[in-house]
C-alpha cells in the first residue's frame, strides 16, 4: 500500500515537473472586446490556470513614453491582473507595438539616445502601477538599419529592469516577438545578441502564406510540403525553429507560436488542391469581420457541410466549401506541434490568441473552453 502511494505520488510529481518545465505563453488582444455578441472577449473569460504567461496586446507609445491604447485599457489591465488572485503563479506581460503600430515609430525612438532613454525609463513604473510582471517588445519587421538599434533597445531595457529590481522587487521579465520568415529575421534581428538579454522569444510561426501569394496554401505548416517550390523551403515552423537555433537563440528561450486562427481564400476556379488559384482573401467571419482571417470558433461553424482534408507532410488541415478554402489548425495539429517543440527541447509554446480560440466552449461542440490551447497544455504536461 505504501509503495503504491509512493509510486502515485512520484507520477504526480513528474507530471507537475513536466508541466512546469514548459512555458505556455498566451496573447490576449484588447480589440476582441469590440466583436459582436458571443465573439466579444474580455480578460475575465480567461482561465487563470490555462497558461503560464498571459500577454496583453497592445500598449502604445506617446511622447516617447509607454501609454495605453484603448480608452478602457486601465480597467482591462486590472481585470487581467486580478486573475493572479486565483493563480499567484500566473505571469502577465504587456506587449508594446504590434503590426498596426508600425516599425517606423519604433525606429525613430530607438535610433536616438534621448528618446530611447525616455521610453525605457517610462516602462518599469507603468508596469508596476498596473500590476504587470514584464514587457513584451513587438517590434515587427524592423529594417536592416534598425538591427543595431533594436539590439541596443533590448540591452538597455534589460539593464533598466536589473537596476530597478535592486530596490528589492522581483525583476521584470523581458520578451520579444519575432517574425518567422528568414528574410525578416536576417534583415532586422541580431538573434544571438538579443537572446542574451531576453527571458524568452516568441517565434511567430504562423504567417507563412497569405492572399498575396495568389494561390492557396497553409500559413502555419509544421514541415515543408513535398510539393512546395524551392522558394517555399523556408516557409514552415521546422525550418524557422532550426534557423533561429543556428543563429544563436538558446532552445530554452525559444517559444514556438501556434495560431488559433485560420486563413481563408476565395477560389478562382474549381481546383482546390495545392497551388489552386485564388481571386482574393476569403469572406469575413461573422464576428472577426476581416477578409481572409477566421477565428477557430468561426471555423468550427464553417466546417458544418465543408469537406475537410489534411496535408500529411505539413501536418495541418484545411477545408473547402463552395468557393471558400480555409487553412487552420485543429486539436490534432496543435498537439503535433507541441510534441515537436518538446522534441526540440524548446522553452514552450505561444498561442495567438486566446480570444480566437473557442473561449466560450460553445462553438465547437466539445463543451470545452479553449479547446486548442487546452490541447497544447495537455501535451506540454505529458497528458
From Swiss-Prot:
Residues 1-21 form the signal peptide. It comes from the Eukaryota. Chitin binds at residues 70-71, 97-100, 141, 204-207, 263, 352. InterPro entries: Chitinase_II/V-like_cat, Chitinase_insertion_sf, Glyco_hydro18_cat, Glycoside_hydrolase_SF, Glycosyl_Hydrlase_18. GO terms for cellular component: cytoplasm; endoplasmic reticulum; extracellular space; perinuclear region of cytoplasm. Glycans are attached at residue 60. Keywords: Antimicrobial, Apoptosis, Cytoplasm, Disulfide bond, Endoplasmic reticulum, Glycoprotein, Inflammatory response, Lectin, Secreted, Signal. GO terms for molecular function: carbohydrate binding; chitin binding. GO terms for biological process: activation of NF-kappaB-inducing kinase activity; apoptotic process; carbohydrate metabolic process; cellular response to tumor necrosis factor; chitin catabolic process; inflammatory response; lung development; positive regulation of angiogenesis. Disulfide bonds join 26-51, 300-364. Residues 324-338 are annotated as: Important for AKT1 activation and IL8 production. Residues 22-383 form the GH18 domain. Detected in mammary gland. The keyword NAD does not apply. CDD domains: GH18_chitolectin_chitotriosidase. It is found in: Secreted, Extracellular space; Cytoplasm; Cytoplasm, Perinuclear region; Endoplasmic reticulum. It holds the Pfam family Glyco_hydro_18. PANTHER family: CHITINASE (PTHR11177), CHITINASE-3-LIKE PROTEIN 1 (PTHR11177:SF202). Belongs to the glycosyl hydrolase 18 family. Monomer. Carbohydrate-binding lectin with a preference for chitin. Has no chitinase activity. May play a role in tissue remodeling and in the capacity of cells to respond to and cope with changes in their environment. Plays a role in T-helper cell type 2 (Th2) inflammatory response and IL-13-induced inflammation, regulating allergen sensitization, inflammatory cell apoptosis, dendritic cell accumulation and M2 macrophage differentiation. Facilitates invasion of pathogenic enteric bacteria into colonic mucosa and lymphoid organs. This is Chitinase-3-like protein 1. It comes from Bubalus bubalis (Domestic water buffalo). The lineage of its organism: Eukaryota, Metazoa, Chordata, Craniata, Vertebrata. The gene is CHI3L1.
